[in-house]
Amino acid sequence: MFKKISGVNKEQAVHSLKLWAICFFQYFSNRKLSRIIQFVERTTNTLDEKEQEEEKAMQTSVIGFPRIGTLRELKFASEKYFRNEIKAEELLQTAKDLRKAHWMTQKEAGITFISSNDFSHYDLVLDTAVLLGIVPKRYQELQLSALDTYFAMARGYQGTSGDVKALAMKKWFNTNYHYIVPEAEDDTVIHLSASKLFDEYAEAKELGIATKPVVIGAYTMLKLCRFTGEKKAEDFIGDLTAAYQELLKECQKQQIAWVQFDEPALVRDMDAQDVELFHRLYDAVLQEKGNCRVLVQTYFGDVRDVYQDLTAMDFDGIGLDFLEGKETVRLIEAYGLSRTAFRLTKSCLRDLSMERIFGRIITRKHCRR
């Protein structure tokens, strides 16, 4: 269950885990803390005979990696670019250097599934909007470079090519971060129109790292969009579905093993129409996944309104929130997981309290059959 740490024996590791659980007492109820410590004690008794087997089975994934740089390199380079002190090539090189450093840090740490496309020059929602061709006409008409059009959407533009304000910003769920609100017009044609996701995958592959591309999922993207004309969200479902299908087809062409769809909107209150919309999108999208495995990643809470639907669908992995997701453990204990996707035994289910600490993604390979 645990990776072997050089120079640390079993007893030291178990003792450290107990102390760690106690230090994080404020995040857990007495009952859950007790279950964590009981799990650690059970592990002590079984670690010896299962050590090699569990080490092979243990895999780790991160949702994404901070992009700004340890010395805020991205911030300073971006500000210089906005002041016309450096050219686009220098900004792009800084970004490339940061991505390399971040990927290598994760590789050296032994992370199994390292994310790509989690880097952004400004905002990941804006990145996804550009990926899907959701670019309002007023920005296209500026006839700027792709990079400057992107920044015009994020910051506004006043110059020889025109004068436009930035897109609106809204709070990103329950955080202090604000995202750029995508804006779909009546004549917007959603389609796969940018290559950033695949470019960064290829960039990491040149370093010997096969990454897990990350992109905001279709349901969350539709919920975050602002529709400025006569059309409503449902009018864009067909094109949006086709765009994500095309994305998965391209992933297969490039032999990408895993792709992560971030769906934090699933933790919000969902009525029957919302659940139906989620099915309508992903029942179609997942038909095109082929050999590419799809992880649906949630965060900022639990998915109580869609949990049973989620586990019954053809996802290959589900990322659940065991910190802010107050109902997550109860949902798993009450409803279990899909037999086809997650073959959990009772012993594995009892150990799920540790998922809250380690934040592991539960997939087929993590569970005893």
Residue spans for each PLM region:
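Low-complexity, intrinsically disordered or signal/transmembrane-proximal segments
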Residues: 12-15, 26-27, 38, 52
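Domain-level signal for soluble alpha/beta catalytic cores
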Residues: 53-369
